[in-house]
Amino acid sequence: MKRVCFAALCLAFMLEACRNSTSPVASSSPTSSDISSSDQVVKAYSHFIPTSSPPTNLELVISPGFHINANPASFPYLIATEVKPGKADGIAVSDKLTYPPPKMETFAFADTPLAVYEGSVTIPIPLTPAPGAKGQRTIPFEIRVQACDHEKCYPPSTLTASLPIDLDAIRR
């Protein structure tokens, strides 16, 4: 009975999170002529799902026809995607993140394939609650990206995201 109640509670929480989520809904994709900086084609969303491991992740959504450099970038002169977690009382957030595997793409401006991210990219955020820490916390993030299309790259941007976390839900 306890498992059924717990499963129902988790499902209700996840449905509520989806209903209140800031997850992306495709609207119209920008065109190259409309773009003046990378933040116009890359959006950052945070997700807290207490039943996953880790329970937190950051999702970058890149508009169709664009890409961002992977981490690590293919060459030192390329600007790699970089996530910098901020501080939150009662939570230790690792600054050593594991970035997803890139897609290797060939572009007219490069002699060799480049490591890039396209579409949706999920970056797990490992965290450790401090002993005895309870309640709600919010972790701020800065995400450095440089968006490119098949012909050129746009000025880099630093995106921000906030990740609300319920420490009590993680410990259940």
Positions of predicted regions on the chain:
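C-terminal motif of bacterial Sec signal peptides marking the signal peptidase cleavage site
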Residues: 14-17
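Extracellular/lumen-exposed scaffold segments
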Residues: 19-172
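Sec-dependent signal peptide recognition
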Residues: 2-8
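N-terminal hydrophobic targeting signals that begin at the initiator methionine
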Residues: 1-2, 19
